[in-house]
């Protein structure tokens, strides 16, 4: 589990390699990632947008921007949490993802919340020792 806290908003991410949806012989590897967004602060906030930077082991970078997450712009009151699962394919057996969410308070103030960097490692990734 990977976690990051920004301005009392805690982001937890748990990636899972999906062997049954991957085709390693065709350089196609798929991961699911489960995200929990916890509002540990005193303000009600709404998740407005997301940004992801996904880099595979070959250095290929894919950036994703868009409104909300999984078709929603969830409202989180103090003490509430929102969870969702999504996924990403890579053309290499490993990679890394990170990003941020744009949040907005009830007063209209917007701020970014960090999504922690997390590794995407399949059993097909070659391990390197230094």
UniProtKB/Swiss-Prot annotation:
Disulfide bonds: none annotated. It comes from the Bacteria. One of its GO terms (biological process) is error-free translesion synthesis. Coiled coil: none annotated. Residues 3-127 form the ApaG domain. HAMAP family: ApaG. This is Protein ApaG. It comes from Parvibaculum lavamentivorans (strain DS-1 / DSM 13023 / NCIMB 13966). The gene is apaG.
């Amino acid at each position: 589990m990977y976690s990051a806290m920004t301005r009392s908003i805690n982001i937890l991410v748990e990636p899972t390699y999906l062997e049954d949806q991957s085709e390693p012989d065709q350089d196609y590897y798929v991961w699911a990632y489960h995200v929990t967004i916890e509002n540990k602060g005193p303000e009600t906030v709404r998740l407005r947008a997301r940004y992801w930077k996904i880099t595979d082991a070959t250095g290929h970078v894919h950036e994703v921007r868009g409104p909300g997450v999984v078709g929603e712009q969830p409202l989180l009151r103090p003490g509430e949490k929102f969870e969702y699962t999504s996924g990403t394919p890579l053309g290499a057996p490993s990679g890394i993802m990170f990003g941020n969410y744009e949040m907005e308070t009830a007063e209209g103030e917007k701020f970014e919340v960090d999504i922690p960097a997390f590794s995407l490692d399949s059993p097909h990734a070659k391990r390197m020792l230094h």
